[in-house]
């Protein structure tokens, strides 16, 4: 039997964005209903004046990371 190692399924990988100031995580799949950001909104499509809903740090202070579910 020949078993090939496979990379994690794309559905298992998710790009999220973390605030450098407070650690808040913006998950595009969840959006942020408190700030009227609908689920499915990619980070790069957020308004330029969007800021962290926890500490008000600007959007350009978020860093991208990929987590494996």
Swiss-Prot record:
UniProt xrefs under InterPro entries: Rubredoxin-like_dom, Rubredoxin_dom, Rubredoxin_ET
Record-level GO BP terms: alkane catabolic process
GO MF annotation terms: electron transfer activity; iron ion binding
PROSITE patterns xref list: RUBREDOXIN_LIKE
Binding site for Fe cation: 19, 22, 52, 55
Cofactor binding note: Binds 1 Fe(3+) ion per subunit.
Gene3D superfamilies: 2.20.28.10
Domain Rubredoxin-like stretches: 14-69
Keywords assigned by UniProt, alphabetized: Electron transport, Iron, Metal-binding, Transport
Top-level taxon of origin: Bacteria
Transmembrane region(s): none
Cofactors (names): Fe(3+)
CDD domains to which the protein is assigned, alphabetical: rubredoxin (cd00730)
Subunit structure: Monomer.
Family listed: Belongs to the rubredoxin family.
Protein role: Serves as an electron acceptor for pyruvate ferredoxin oxidoreductase (PFOR).
Listed name of the protein: Rubredoxin-1
Annotated organism of origin: Chlorobaculum tepidum (strain ATCC 49652 / DSM 12025 / NBRC 103806 / TLS) (Chlorobium tepidum)
